[in-house]
C-alpha cells in the first residue's frame, strides 16, 4: 500500500522536491531496486497485453523476461542496479496482509462471475488483481540476476527499508520503487517509474527527502508521524483525517501524542488500541542488514548459463538471449565515463543536518516577515514553535 496520498501532498505543498528526468540522467548511478515491485509489474504487464509467457508446463516466465530485458535497458543507460528482495513481513503488517487476503477472495468471486458471464474485460481486470509474486518467482529472478552478473540483496524484512539503508550508507544513490514509504524509512532519494517499460514513455520521477521536509515544514520524526496519519501498512489511521487535515495537525502540534490530546473526538474516530508508537519505531529503527557490510559487485555475465536457464523449457529465443548477453558484456566494459559529481564526496544526510537546514530557512523566513511588518506597520504572524 505504501503511504496513502503522500505523492499528491508533496506535489501540492513541496513541488520543489520532485524532478522529472529521462533515464539517461542517472548515468553512472547505483540504484537499489525493490525487486518484488518489479516482478509484480512484469507479471501484470504481460497479462495486460493479452498473453501470458509460460514454460511448456504452463509456469509463467513473464517475470524473467521483464527482469532480463529491463535490467539490460538500465545497464545500457549506464545505471548499475542492485535488486533487493523482501524477507519476512513485520508482525505489524499482519492486519494489512489480512485485508489483502480478503480482497483477493473477493476478486476470485468476481472473476468467477465474470467468467460465467463471458465478460472478457472484467475477466482481465480481476485476473490482474489476483497476480502475486511467489517465492518461486523470487528464486528464479535471483538465479537469473546471478547469471547476468547483477548483484542482489536478501532483506531480513521489508525491501524498501533495506533499500533506504543502502542509500543512507552511501552504497547507492537512490531507491527505485513505487511505494512511497521508502521515504518514510529515510531514503534520501526515491525514483518512481524507473523500471517502467520504454513504451509507456513515463519520465522518471525523483523525490528529494531533504527538499520535501523543507517544503512540508517538518523534520524527519514529524514526517514519520505524518505518514502514519495518512495511512501506512503497519497500523490503522484515524478515520476522517485526510492529507490536508493531517499536515495541518502535524504543523500545529508536531507529534501524534499532542494531536490526540487536542483532537475533537466527536469528529474523528481514533482506532482502539492504536499501535502508532510501534509503527513509528518500525520506521525509525527497521530490521535491516548492516548496509556498510554489504559488498556490491557487478560481474561478467555467464552467456552459456543464461542460454541454458532461459531457453529449452522456458522457451526463450536463443538468438535473443545471446544478443542480450552481448549487451550485458558491452555495458560492463563501456562504462568508462564518470559523473563529474563523483569526484566530490557527498556525506549521507543526517537528522541533525536536516534540522539545521530547516532552522536556517525558518530564521530567514522570520527575518523577512519582521522586515515586512516594520514597513507595513502590521504585525507578522508567527508559527507555533517546534
Curated annotation (Swiss-Prot):
Segments for region (I-domain) = 122-253
Q: According to the UniProt record, where is the region Disordered?
A: 354-386
Q: Where in this protein does the record put region N-domain?
A: 1-104
Which terms in the GO cellular component ontology are assigned? mitochondrion; nucleolus; nucleoplasm
Binding-site list for Mg(2+) 1: 34, 86, 158, 160
Please list which residues make up the signal peptide.
none
Q: Which PROSITE patterns match?
A: XPG_1 (PS00841), XPG_2 (PS00842)
What is one Gene Ontology biological process annotated in the Swiss-Prot or TrEMBL record? DNA replication, removal of RNA primer
Q: Extract the GO molecular function terms from the UniProt entry.
A: 5'-3' exonuclease activity; 5'-flap endonuclease activity; DNA binding; magnesium ion binding; manganese ion binding; RNA-DNA hybrid ribonuclease activity
The cofactor note from the UniProt entry for this protein is: Binds 2 magnesium ions per subunit. They probably participate in the reaction catalyzed by the enzyme. May bind an additional third magnesium ion after substrate binding.
**Binding-site positions, Mg(2+) 2:** 179, 181, 233
Residue sites binding DNA per the record: 47, 70, 158, 231, 233
Q: Where found? A: Nucleus, Nucleolus; Nucleus, Nucleoplasm; Mitochondrion
Q: Tell me yes or no: is Ligase among this UniProt entry's keywords.
A: no
Which SUPFAM superfamilies has this protein been placed in? 5' to 3' exonuclease, C-terminal subdomain (SSF47807), PIN domain-like (SSF88723)
Principal location: nucleus
**What Gene3D superfamilies would the database entry show?**
5' to 3' exonuclease, C-terminal subdomain, 5'-nuclease
Where are the annotated segments for Interaction with PCNA? Answer: 336-344
The prosthetic group or cofactor this protein requires is:
Mg(2+)
Q: Does the keyword Lyase apply?
A: no
Summary of subunit composition and partner proteins: Interacts with PCNA. Three molecules of FEN1 bind to one PCNA trimer with each molecule binding to one PCNA monomer. PCNA stimulates the nuclease activity without altering cleavage specificity.
Functional note:
Structure-specific nuclease with 5'-flap endonuclease and 5'-3' exonuclease activities involved in DNA replication and repair. During DNA replication, cleaves the 5'-overhanging flap structure that is generated by displacement synthesis when DNA polymerase encounters the 5'-end of a downstream Okazaki fragment. It enters the flap from the 5'-end and then tracks to cleave the flap base, leaving a nick for ligation. Also involved in the long patch base excision repair (LP-BER) pathway, by cleaving within the apurinic/apyrimidinic (AP) site-terminated flap.
Concerning its family, UniProt says: Belongs to the XPG/RAD2 endonuclease family. FEN1 subfamily.
Family matches, as HAMAP family: Fen
Q: What is this protein called?
A: Flap endonuclease 1
Q: What gene makes this protein? A: Fen1
Amino acid at each position: 500500500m505504501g503511504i496513502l496520498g503522500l505523492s499528491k501532498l508533496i506535489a501540492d505543498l513541496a513541488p520543489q522536491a520532485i524532478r522529472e528526468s529521462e533515464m539517461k540522467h542517472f548515468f553512472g548511478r547505483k540504484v537499489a531496486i525493490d525487486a518484488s515491485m518489479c516482478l509484480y509489474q512484469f507479471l501484470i504487464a504481460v497479462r495486460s497485453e493479452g498473453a501470458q509467457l509460460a514454460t511448456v508446463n504452463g509456469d509463467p516466465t513473464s517475470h524473467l523476461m521483464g527482469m532480463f530485458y529491463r535490467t539490460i535497458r538500465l545497464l545500457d543507460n549506464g545505471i548499475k542496479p542492485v535488486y533487493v528482495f523482501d524477507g519476512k513481513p513485520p508482525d505489524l503488517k499482519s492486519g494489512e496482509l489480512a485485508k489483502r487476503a480478503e480482497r483477493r477472495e473477493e476478486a476470485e468471486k468476481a472473476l468467477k462471475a465474470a467468467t460465467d458471464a463471458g465478460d472478457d474485460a472484467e475477466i482481465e481486470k480481476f485476473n490482474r488483481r489476483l497476480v502475486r509474486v511467489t517465492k518461486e518467482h523470487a528464486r528464479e529472478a535471483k538465479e537469473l540476476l546471478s547469471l547476468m552478473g547483477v548483484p542482489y540483496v536478501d532483506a531480513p524484512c521489508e525491501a524498501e527499508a533495506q533499500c533506504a539503508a543502502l542509500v543512507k550508507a552511501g552504497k547507492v544513490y537512490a531507491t527505485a520503487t513505487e511505494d512511497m514509504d521508502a521515504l518514510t524509512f529515510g531514503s534520501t532519494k526515491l525514483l518512481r517509474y524507473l523500471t517502467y517499460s520504454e513504451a509507456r514513455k513515463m519520465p522518471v520521477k525523483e523525490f528529494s527527502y531533504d527538499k520535501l521536509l523543507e517544503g512540508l515544514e517538518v523534520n524527519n520524526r514529524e514526517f514519520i508521524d505524518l505518514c502514519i496519519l495518512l495511512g501506512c501498512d503497519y497500523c490503522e489511521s484515524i478515520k476522517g483525517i485526510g492529507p490536508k487535515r493531517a499536515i495541518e495537525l502535524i504543523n500545529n502540534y508536531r507529534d501524534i501524542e499532542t494531536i490526540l490530546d487536542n483532537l475533537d473526538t466527536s469528529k474523528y474516530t481514533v482506532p482502539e488500541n492504536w499501535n502508532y508508537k510501534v509503527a513509528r519505531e518500525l520506521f525509525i529503527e527497521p530490521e535491516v542488514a548492516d548496509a556498510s557490510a554489504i559488498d556490491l559487485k557487478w560481474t561478467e555475465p555467464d552467456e552459456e548459463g543464461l542460454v541454458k536457464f532461459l531457453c529449452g523449457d522456458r522457451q526463450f529465443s536463443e538468438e535473443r538471449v545471446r544478443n542480450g548477453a552481448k549487451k550485458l558484456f558491452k555495458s560492463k566494459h563501456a562504462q568508462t565515463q564518470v559523473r563529474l559529481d563523483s569526484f566530490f564526496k557527498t556525506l549521507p544526510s543526517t537528522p541533525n543536518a536536516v534540522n539545521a537546514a530547516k532552522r536556517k530557512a525558518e530564521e530567514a523566513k522570520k527575518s523577512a516577515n519582521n522586515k515586512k511588518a516594520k514597513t507595513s506597520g502590521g504585525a507578522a504572524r508567527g508559527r507555533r514553535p517546534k
